[in-house]
Amino acid sequence: DGMNAAIANTMNKDYAAAKRAIAKDMSAEADYLRAVIASEEGDMRTAEAQLKSAVKKDEKMAKKAMKDIHFKKLFEEGLKF
């Protein structure tokens, strides 16, 4: 399953492989994971865009994101959904 492979690759810091594993997955969960990966890579602009896309698809992602350390900086900088 692409999502499980992507999560495992993200945990192992193999971000390129993680992105490939979910490249065709357009779900809210995949967008959220792409936001996490972008955050890990220091690309906060992409992290914000992917996070907003995830929340647009599934409002519950907003609550999850507010508790996620990966996005603390975005919220401190005024991110709103």
Q: Where are each of the predicted segments found?
A:
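Alpha-helical adaptor scaffolds
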Residues: 1-43
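Alpha-helical repeat scaffolds
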Residues: 14-25, 46-54, 78-81
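TPR/TPR-like (Sel1-like) alpha-helical repeat modules
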Residues: 26-28, 39-63
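Terminal, low-structured helical/coil segments at or just beyond the last alpha-helical repeat
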Residues: 56-81
